[in-house]
């Protein structure tokens, strides 16, 4: 019997440039819903997990996330918008979205 390998379609959320979203990697957990995030633009920001996502997404060091910098202090602070799963991170690597970050 010949095994057929079918590639499953994966829907992956991409950062929206028009909404000022950036890819980032969690570097350190700080507590009180705060994390240190290394962003794709080369800056390290203090990330906040908003209350609406606090119990829905659990983040760990090394997770790839989408962040949205604040309008005030945008170079220093941001909000976590989305966390990627392992299969989504593999897809992002294959497509070249994480080349500069990793």
Swiss-Prot record:
Protein name per UniProt: Translation initiation factor 1A
SMART domains: eIF1a (SM00652)
PANTHER family: EIF-1A
Function: Seems to be required for maximal rate of protein biosynthesis. Enhances ribosome dissociation into subunits and stabilizes the binding of the initiator Met-tRNA(I) to 40 S ribosomal subunits.
Record's keyword terms, sorted: Initiation factor, Protein biosynthesis
Annotated source species: Methanocaldococcus jannaschii (strain ATCC 43067 / DSM 2661 / JAL-1 / JCM 10045 / NBRC 100440)
Matching NCBIfam families: eIF-1A, PRK04012.1-3, PRK04012.1-5
Record has Protein biosynthesis as a keyword: yes
Pfam families, sorted: eIF-1a (PF01176)
Any one cellular-component term (Gene Ontology): cytoplasm
GO biological process: translational initiation
Family label: Belongs to the eIF-1A family.
Residue ranges of every copy of the S1-like domain listed in the record: 10-85
GO MF entries: RNA binding; translation initiation factor activity
InterPro entries, sorted: NA-bd_OB-fold, RNA-binding_domain_S1_IF1, TIF_eIF-1A, TIF_eIF-1A_CS
């Amino acid at each position: 019997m010949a095994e057929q390998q079918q590639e499953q379609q994966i829907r992956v959320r991409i950062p929206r440039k028009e909404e000022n979203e950036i890819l980032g990697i969690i570097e350190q957990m700080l507590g009180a819903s705060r994390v240190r995030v290394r962003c794709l633009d080369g800056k390290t920001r203090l990330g906040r997990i908003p209350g609406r996502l606090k119990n829905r997404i659990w983040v760990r060091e090394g997770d790839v996330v989408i962040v949205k910098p604040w309008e005030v202090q945008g170079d220093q602070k941001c909000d976590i918008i989305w966390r990627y799963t392992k299969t989504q991170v593999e897809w992002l690597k294959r497509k070249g979205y994480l080349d500069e970050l990793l």
